Amino acid sequence: MVPAYIPNPVAALCGGGTPIDFCRNYTDGRRILGNGKTYRGLICGVLAGVLIGLVQIWLVGTYHWDLPRQTILSVTLLALGALLGDMGKSFIKRRLGKERGEAWPVADQYDLVVGAFLLTIIFDPAWFFAVVTLPVLIAILVITPVLHRSVNILGYWIKVKKEPW
């Protein structure tokens, strides 16, 4: 799951530039995604997630670390899925009239999990169901909000984020 946890903070660090929605509005008159979702953030975030996944693959293969077996496909799907989940949440937030940075408990914490899981289930279901067992799922559900909050507070302290959530 580490390849899914890395992309969002890296996207925040590296973001800026052209918004993915090209500043266009949806049929409701609101932005499709908003300025917080940029091509630079997407590319950097996915690359960082894939890179950390490749490190995991290397550690398991070289040092026989007891980590979930990853593949290049699984780390790519987890990394991309995490950011697609975040974008999906942003799309829904805009439809609900929520502003960029406005807190949306639960959705803010689990969007990356939903996106990563959905993309992986669609394109690599054998890997997903072999690795994401019930104990692993429970661990992810418990760890994710704590990790999310901690990283966001850190991002706020170092002035990468305007809000600590």
Curated annotation (Swiss-Prot):
Cofactor(s) this protein cannot do without: Mg(2+)
Gene Ontology biological process terms in this record: glycerophospholipid biosynthetic process
Keyword Heme found: no
Pathway info: Membrane lipid metabolism; glycerophospholipid metabolism
Presence of the UniProt keyword Magnesium in the record: yes
Key words, A-Z: Cell membrane, Lipid biosynthesis, Lipid metabolism, Magnesium, Membrane, Phospholipid biosynthesis, Phospholipid metabolism, Transferase, Transmembrane, Transmembrane helix
Superkingdom field: Archaea
Stored Pfam families: CarS-like (PF01864)
An annotated Gene Ontology molecular function: CDP-2,3-bis-(O-geranylgeranyl)-sn-glycerol synthase activity
Reactions accelerated catalytically: 2,3-bis-O-(geranylgeranyl)-sn-glycerol 1-phosphate + CTP + H(+) = CDP-2,3-bis-O-(geranylgeranyl)-sn-glycerol + diphosphate
Membrane topology listed for this record: Multi-pass membrane protein
UniProt EC number: 2.7.7.67
Main subcellular location of this protein, as a coarse class: membrane
Transmembrane parts of this sequence: 41-61, 72-92, 103-123, 127-147
UniProt subcellular location: Cell membrane
GO CC annotation: plasma membrane
InterPro entries for this protein: CarS, CarS_archaea
Similarity comment text for this entry: Belongs to the CDP-archaeol synthase family.
Role played: Catalyzes the formation of CDP-2,3-bis-(O-geranylgeranyl)-sn-glycerol (CDP-archaeol) from 2,3-bis-(O-geranylgeranyl)-sn-glycerol 1-phosphate (DGGGP) and CTP. This reaction is the third ether-bond-formation step in the biosynthesis of archaeal membrane lipids.
Protein name: CDP-archaeol synthase
Species per Swiss-Prot/TrEMBL record: Methanoregula boonei (strain DSM 21154 / JCM 14090 / 6A8)
